[in-house]
Amino acid sequence: MSDLTTIARPYAKAAFDFAVDKGQLDQWGQMLSFAAEVAKNEQMNELLTSSFSAEKMAEIFVAVCGEQVDAHGQNLLKVMAENGRLAALPDVCEQFFILKKEHEKEIDVEVISASELSDEQLANIGSKLEARLERKVKLNCSVDETLLGGVIIRAGDLVIDDSARGRLNRLSDALQS
């Protein structure tokens, strides 16, 4: 975990709480996404590491964002500039979307299989995970032929390794102990 992630959490939480109170989660998500892209820009990155005053930096950043960021979003940008934290905007955006998904009871699940899974198999995996996790599940599927067979499922901190490679590794560990 990077230092910027730790720095970003309180800003993301404040933006998230405000957005929930105002019923503007999607709007804030769009504003933060735009501001994060601006912060990632190479020229803007040079500005963020320059010796401009915090006030001037905030003024420039807000001007670049223009109408994409409302007055409340501009206030967040100004506070972050005053504290020298504009470089953390991409992490603030990421943390905001983590909070948003948690709030909306959604979770991204990575499904890695040895071969392409059928729609029926994916629907079965999705429904079982939704029941177990009590969340709406979004499956991100990929193929890794080195698994030999089976699947690996990653959902947040939960990892289910039901691959042939995983089973062989567990068997090997059991035989060696």
From Swiss-Prot:
Query: What superkingdom heads the lineage?
Result: Bacteria
Instruction: Tell me what topology the record assigns in the membrane.
Output: Peripheral membrane protein
The GO molecular function terms of this record are: proton-transporting ATP synthase activity, rotational mechanism
Q: Which Gene3D superfamilies match?
A: N-terminal domain of the delta subunit of the F1F0-ATP synthase
**InterPro entries recorded for this chain?**
ATP_synth_OSCP/delta_N_sf, ATPase_OSCP/d_CS, ATPase_OSCP/dsu
Identify the main location: membrane
Q: Where in the cell is it found?
A: Cell inner membrane
Which key words tag this protein in UniProt? ATP synthesis, Cell inner membrane, Cell membrane, CF(1), Hydrogen ion transport, Ion transport, Membrane, Transport
**Pfam families, A to Z:** OSCP
Q: Which GO terms describe its cellular component?
A: plasma membrane; proton-transporting ATP synthase complex
Function per UniProt:
F(1)F(0) ATP synthase produces ATP from ADP in the presence of a proton or sodium gradient. F-type ATPases consist of two structural domains, F(1) containing the extramembraneous catalytic core and F(0) containing the membrane proton channel, linked together by a central stalk and a peripheral stalk. During catalysis, ATP synthesis in the catalytic domain of F(1) is coupled via a rotary mechanism of the central stalk subunits to proton translocation. This protein is part of the stalk that links CF(0) to CF(1). It either transmits conformational changes from CF(0) to CF(1) or is implicated in proton conduction.
Against PANTHER family, the record matches this protein to: ATP SYNTHASE DELTA CHAIN (PTHR11910)
Q: What NCBIfam families does UniProt report for this protein, alphabetically?
A: ATP_synt_delta (TIGR01145), PRK05758.2-2 (NF004402), PRK05758.2-5 (NF004404)
The family annotation for this protein states:
Belongs to the ATPase delta chain family.
What does the subunit comment say?
F-type ATPases have 2 components, F(1) - the catalytic core - and F(0) - the membrane proton channel. F(1) has five subunits: alpha(3), beta(3), gamma(1), delta(1), epsilon(1). F(0) has three main subunits: a(1), b(2) and c(10-14). The alpha and beta chains form an alternating ring which encloses part of the gamma chain. F(1) is attached to F(0) by a central stalk formed by the gamma and epsilon chains, while a peripheral stalk is formed by the delta and b chains.
- Protein name as catalogued: ATP synthase subunit delta
- By which gene is this protein encoded? atpH
